[in-house]
Regions:
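Beta-strand/loop-rich accessory regions of lumenal/periplasmic or secreted enzymes
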Residues: 2-303
Length: 304
């Protein structure tokens, strides 16, 4: 009755390294009222089906509802998990479907938590584009380390804003600012590591990858940005269109925008996430190449 994998291990020379523990309820969202909903439990109505069954590949589809603690359904999740023989890489294609009137229910934050049995020692955050690339290392010391893209040029806006920071006891402290975050970050656990890769992370802002005591998180709408996933015309004009709205829409008033119908019920947002575990310590070139290949997959792939 839980959409995410509950447990996972990585084989290494006859030994098993525990990667995930009690991670099944990791598909989450937070609505505008601060309520957390998860795709877990009987009320979530989790369903399973196979889109592809071997021998070289397995594609598992899992579906269910984001449900609050009191049983209220806020949205629906459709996720496809891609497994390939001979490799520990997992690709996840996730869609959130807005089942409620978005004038009544919208969201501050949503994503996936991969809950690990221990915290990483340090986190490596990729900044800049693949052509102008650098990696920032941050020691965790029991805290969460995050990399977030808060803004990116769109329409007439030309602002870039990416941040690597540390969250401790509910307080965020920036460590380094940059124009863009690259598509991946890596948690080093000593005898193994986990890379989270998110294609088009900067361009599809606000996005976040974080590692800490709770595990690894791929955040598909980051609440740290201060923005909300809100389809009301007033919010779209002021928080996303910005100066373009002033020029094209002639600086509409709040009253005018409140009269614009903007219900996105039935729409969906879809993302690809790569979960890439590796045995051994951090090797930057190996991690970088695997993450970049995940973010730039081949256009043609033989089926088996």
């Amino acid at each position: 009755d839980k959409l995410m994998p509950q447990e996972a291990w990585l084989g290494n020379g006859g030994n098993r390294i525990e990667l995930l523990r009690n991670s099944g309820n990791g598909m989450y969202l937070v609505d505008q009222k601060g309520r957390t909903a998860r795709v877990a439990g009987q009320s979530a109505e989790v369903e399973n089906s196979f889109a592809k069954e071997g021998p070289g590949r397995v594609v598992l589809k899992r579906s269910g509802y984001y449900v609050t603690d009191d049983g209220e359904k806020l949205a629906r999740a459709e996720s496809w998990f891609y497994f390939a023989a001979g490799t520990p890489l997992i690709r996840i294609t996730h869609s959130i479907i807005f089942t409620r009137d978005t004038n009544e229910v919208w969201f501050r934050d949503y994503g996936m938590e991969f809950k690990t049995p221990e915290a990483p020692r340090d986190v490596y955050c990729a900044l800049g584009s693949q052509d102008n690339h650098r990696v920032k290392r941050v020691e965790t010391n029991g805290r969460e380390v995050y990399m977030v893209q808060e803004d990116y040029p769109h329409f007439l806006e030309r602002t870039y804003k990416a941040t690597v920071g540390i969250s401790d006891k509910g307080k965020d402290a920036p460590v380094e600012n940059a124009e863009t975050a690259d598509d991946w970050a890596h948690g080093n656990y000593g005898n193994h590591g986990i890379t989270i890769a998110m294609p088009w992370l900067a361009e599809r802002f606000p996005k976040e990858i974080s590692f800490g005591p709770q595990g690894a998180r791929a955040v598909l709408w980051s609440g740290r940005s201060g923005k909300e996933l809100d389809f009301r015309a007033k919010t779209i004009a002021k928080d996303y269109m910005k100066s373009w709205a002033g020029i094209i829409l002639k600086n509409p008033s709040d009253k005018d925008l409140d009269n614009v119908k903007s219900n996105a019920q039935g729409a969906a947002r879809t993302h690809d996430i790569w979960f890439i575990p590796q045995a051994g310590g951090y090797r930057e070139e190996v991690v970088k190449k695997m993450a970049q290949r995940a973010s730039n997959p081949p256009l043609l792939l033989a089926d088996t």
